Amino acid sequence: MTLRPPQPVVPNCRVRPSVGALPWIMLCLLAGANLARGAEEEVSFVRDIAPLLTRHCTGCHGPTKVEGDYRLHTFVALQKTGASDSPTLTPGQPEQSELYLRLIDDNESTRMPQWDDPLSAGQIALVERWIRQGAQFDGRDPNVSFKSQMPPRTHPAPPAVYKVAVPVQACAISPDGREVALGGHHEVTVWNLQTGTLLRRLANLPKRIQSIVYEPTGSRLLVAGGTPGDYGEIVALDAADGGNRQVVQTAEDLVLSIALSHDGQHLASGGADRVVRSFIRDGQERWSFAWDSRLFSDWITEVAYGAGDEFVLVACRDYTAKVLTPAGALYTTYNGHQRQFGSENGRFEIYALATEAGGPRVFTAGLGRSIRMWEAAKAQVENGSAADMEERFAQAGHTKYFPHDAQRGVFKLATAGNLLFAATGEGRLRQYELPEGKLLREYPDQQDWLFGLAVHPATERAVTTTRGGVARVWNTTTGELIHEWLAAPGLTLDPAARLAKP
């Protein structure tokens, strides 16, 4: 119901009000104005204003590009003055707020967005109303990007039938070894691991699926992905039908990796926004934010928990792997992918990370010629301090190297007991014996980039997925190919692309 200000009764004859009546008339008018304002819908910064600023303003006034000495990607930055020194926001007074005045400026050289279509009248009115209502911030943290605090997006349904296959960058085998979940276009497809038949489709998810994790019971899935350069998201949902959903996190760029602690109570994430985030289970199925770490200068490509959950391990495209404590503090940095001397010298981006089941060893790989095997505690000792720098440089270090010789690098690592698996950009899956690093088997050439890898020790099965959307199931004891299919509903694998010829 819309409240309207009380209307004065106007007599048929024109009567000049007495001086004594004027205060009562003014009181009625003010009361009517207050009623109208009270009925006006409250404008939300996070819901209504942040999407406008993100879409039209942060391209020139964001964290990297700064026009007019002004950023507005966080609420704290938004409130600061730019080169004009005029107040950006004067709560309650749009006409004294540079943010509003620049939107209605008639001069195209000073109007914002500059040299672009102006905001619509409705959008400008929304900004004006928000400032007039007090310019309140209703997000979680005014110091971090408000794009990462905007409401989750509504995702479209996936295509009923795929016209072309999409790269499958994420795969996960259910704890009981019966199913494998694969990333699709706005969906996760779930297949029978024994027969390769499609079981169900979990739809209305982010455009690109980058990481999938089953919770220990197998009843819930955690799915991460987004849209490159624009949006990231983590969703928790029922594995059976995609119901009971919780958007655990939104981010301003792709979420590339998620990992679940061994006790199933903690979740870590990392991605293209260069932030590691941690979440804690709240009750049975809900997750709440715990902490974040912003120590990274490039994309975070993989996260994992160490044995016993004593560390959160982070692989980064900045040539380092960092080790964090369960509370998010930096424990040490592993620099074995950027060496000046020795046979493994060079600077190499890290794409893959895995940990030893029940042991302290960590495995990292990416570009370069070898997989590195190292331990967090020993890496901390070797880092030492400036006082013992010369002595440390003279030492060989504890890292062991397993050659892979993949010119395109290694994109995924996985461990199973005393076995290490590496999926390469050349299309080959390599299997090593631990701890010596002896190459036990090189699986048949799949002639495509391998993007996804999952291993299930109990059933002796490994799943690989390719850039072309092909999923293959392997026997890890014999190296035999069990099944292969195109993970795109409605399409079938071209016979010429099959490794198992009829």
Model segments located where?
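Bacterial N-terminal signal peptides
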Residues: 20-33
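Serine/threonine-rich, low-complexity intrinsically disordered segments
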Residues: 4, 27, 466-468
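Secreted/luminal cysteine- and crosslink-motif detector
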Residues: 5, 14, 29, 58-61
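N-terminal secretory signal peptides that target proteins for export/translocation
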Residues: 1-19
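WD40-repeat beta-propeller superdomains and closely related acidic/aromatic-rich repeat-like regions
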Residues: 138-502
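Aromatic- and Gly/Pro-enriched helix-to-coil junctions and flexible linker segments
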Residues: 36-175, 184-185
